[in-house]
Design a protein with these regions (language model features):
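Sec-dependent N-terminal signal peptides
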Residues: 21-30
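Positively charged n-region of N-terminal signal peptides that target proteins for export
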Residues: 11, 18-21
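Intrinsic disorder/low-complexity segments
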Residues: 1, 31-34, 403
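Single conserved hydrophobic/aromatic residue that forms the stacking wall/gate
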Residues: 1-13
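Bacterial Sec-dependent signal peptides at the C-terminal "C-region" and cleavage site
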Residues: 29-42
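Short, low-complexity interaction segments enriched in Ser/Thr/Pro/Gly
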Residues: 8, 16-17, 36
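Glycan-recognition and catalytic cores of secretory/periplasmic carbohydrate-active enzymes
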Residues: 39-445
Length: 445
């Protein structure tokens, strides 16, 4: 039997542990933890779940519809009229050459899925969408489809006709190598990176963009996106030549593409001695305007350059572009008009693709700075807008594309207020990055 003193000590210890247990239980209830249950999100992420589930359903719908076709979905064929384009471009009339292109009359305008061969610059995005959706959901059928459509692109490892082989192969084979690595996938990426390096001119310090047009050596701001393939090739091989070439291109582009306010020209063409031939646009409102997707390409590219090099000049460039974008947006939901200098009217098309690219870039940028909360919050606003009924398609509609209301190339009368496969890609990538930063498990939403 316990002595009276020992009994008192025992009672006090028992009371202490009972109080401690009750306190721990209260804290567990207060913060939503349970020893038998997985961690649950503290906020309402219904919009996030809806975006992921819609994307998975739309991609499965598209896979079923296109079957074994090797032509990959890019957009929906839409109509337009030249008067509308003139108003958007502040022109009294379009040139004869433009007018000849601006006549896509078709019985199925607005509903016909627009598919292209593997040599189209967007060919890597549909397989990439499948890979990202698989990573987000763990759905094995999406992985199987991703493998199938990625394999279609295997001949591109030998293609040298465009800088866009970075888009085409990194978004497809790059994701494949992350999620289902194989020696053949790795070698295809390295071969493609070598071909991209073959477009680099050391006198100019840039990778050539297009092989068409009257320009001498065109470089477009979009080209900043192809540098990720070269960074990846350095990681795969241990050879810094790919990375150093990419950073040289980025420095030259920083010097010549950007204005004092950190807005970017779309196209800079160089003379053979490295001097600038001309600065202009091919997809923006005017040579002097700020084409929305072009600004997003620049933000994304310089964020990647800082991530890989830790060179502070690239961080400053990315932050200044981010500041420009957040300052100049005219819309309440932050999804930009197709050009930041476009007419501010209800009729002016938005560009959901620019919003998705910006969101993805800002999420990564938020992880590279000391206090990235403002970037993360702005990216969250963009993603919530894109995940709303105003932009996220209903399952079974929109010909299987995930997002609505993107603009491809308005001055060329191409893909205006329509879905685009690369809008879907960067939307899914942004959702994935958002979940990784917030440590959200899709299964527990």
């Amino acid at each position: 039997a316990l002595s009276s003193a020992a009994s008192d000590v025992y009672k006090r210890q028992l009371l202490y542990y009972m109080k401690k247990t009750l306190l721990l239980c209260y804290i567990a209830i207060l913060y939503g933890f349970s020893g038998c249950s997985p961690k649950q999100p503290e906020k309402d992420y219904t919009w996030l779940k809806q975006g992921i589930e819609t994307a998975a359903l739309q991609l499965k719908f598209t896979v079923a519809e296109i079957g074994d076709s090797i032509r990959l979905p890019r957009s929906i064929w839409t109509g337009y009229d030249t008067d509308f384009l003139c108003r958007q471009l502040d022109k009294k009339q379009l040139t004869g050459k433009d007018s000849a292109r601006l006549k896509p009359i078709h019985d199925n305008l607005g509903s016909r899925r627009y598919c292209f061969s593997i040599y189209d610059w967007t060919s890597g995005f549909f397989p990439g969408n499948l890979w990202l959706a698989y990573q987000l959901t763990g759905d094995e059928s999406l992985r199987e489809s991703a493998v199938k459509f990625t394999n279609y692109l295997y001949p591109l490892r030998e293609y040298k006709g465009t800088h866009d082989i970075g888009f085409m192969m990194n978004c497809s084979y790059g994701n494949a190598n992350r999620l289902s690595p194989a020696d053949s996938v790795r070698s295809a990426l390295i071969q493609t990176a070598d071909n991209l390096c073959g477009r680099f001119n050391p006198e100019i310090g840039c990778i050539r963009s297009w092989n068409f047009g009257k320009w001498n050596f065109p470089v477009i701001i979009d080209n900043m996106m192809n540098l990720d393939l070269l960074f990846y090739a350095t990681r795969l091989t241990g050879d810094d030549k790919y990375k150093e070439l990419a950073l040289t291109h980025a420095r030259t582009t920083m010097k010549n593409h950007f204005r004092d306010d950190y807005s970017s020209y779309h196209v800079v063409s160089y003379n053979n001695d490295g001097t600038v031939e001309k600065k202009c646009t091919h997809q923006g409102k005017s040579d002097a305007s700020s084409w929305a997707r072009g600004q997003a390409w620049g933000l994304y590219g310089y964020t990647s350059c800082y991530r890989e090099s830790k060179d502070v000049q690239f961080l400053r460039q990315a932050e200044n572009i981010a500041s420009l974008i957040m300052r100049r947006v005219k819309t309440e939901d932050a999804v930009p008009l197709w050009d930041y200098d476009a007419p501010d009217t209800p009729q002016t098309p938005r560009d959901a693709s620019a919003a998705a690219i910006t969101a993805s870039a800002l999420i990564e940028l938020s992880t590279l700075v000391e206090d990235g909360q403002a970037y993360m919050e702005y990216a969250g606003k963009l993603l919530k807008s894109l995940s709303s009924d105003g932009y996220l398609a209903k399952p079974g509609t929109n010909r299987g594309f995930v997002l609505m209301h993107s603009t491809g190339s308005l001055p060329n009368g191409s893909e205006i207020d329509t879905p685009l496969n690369y809008a879907d890609y960067y939307y899914l990538e942004a959702l994935l990055r958002y979940m990784q930063v917030k440590e959200i498990d899709y299964k527990h939403i």
